[in-house]
Amino acid sequence: MLRFIRRTFYLAVAGILCFAGFGVYCYLRVDSYHTTEDVSKIGRERHFALLLGTSNKLVGGAANPFYLARIESAVRLYKAGKISGIIASGDNRDRYYNEPARMKRDLTLAGVPESAILTDPMGLRTYDSVIRCRDVFGVKNPIIISQDSHCKRALYIADSLGMKAIGFAAPTPTQSKFRVYNSAREFFARMMAVIDVNVTKGSVDVDELLKEVKESKYFFDIAKKFGK
């Protein structure tokens, strides 16, 4: 009995160490990518931003500062003439929750023309948003907009898909309640990103994606609208 307990204990410790080691590897691997917060460092040769979605409200109903910062960053790039269009990609899990529609609404209220905004309601996860940016919208060198840690994760995914993306980091809220939660969340999200890239390929249904690409007019609309 003692031998069984000891063996179980050692296996549990080994499992925890392997899990922690894999987590650290994933975190550092993703963290090797770089972003910028400086609009002047963004060249004008990139025509599209990929704006990654999140809820516009926190639990309790207060405005989400992460969401507001992403919208403001997208507007800054557009008004500085760095981008011609924005792909607002997020979760539209049901008719009562539609991240892309909210982003489009707030972007237009901030002065971005509605004609410059494309929405992707199937960006359920970061991997989905990035691969759909490439394969559905035909954009292979976007400026990815989100907070720094999220941008790095998206850049890692984009790089694995052969895309030449750059990251424009929206300001990250500094309150301790956000810092602790997001550090923990990002640790696990980066592990999932590495698994997505190397094993599962996200939640994308490849057959459905290829069918959508074949039937989609997004790319041709973009070409007509922005001369790409």
Show where each model-derived region lies:
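N-terminal type II signal-anchor transmembrane helix
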Residues: 2-40
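Positively charged, low-complexity intrinsically disordered regions
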Residues: 4, 47, 212-215
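Enrichment for repetitive, rod-forming helical segments
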Residues: 13-14, 77, 192, 197
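A structural signal for short, hydrophobic/glycine-enriched beta-strand patches
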Residues: 24-183
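A general structural signal for short secondary-structure boundary/capping elements
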Residues: 93-98, 165-169, 188-196, 211-217
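A transmembrane-helix-recognition feature enriched in membrane-embedded lipid enzymes
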Residues: 180-203
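Short linear elements at protein peripheries
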Residues: 202-228
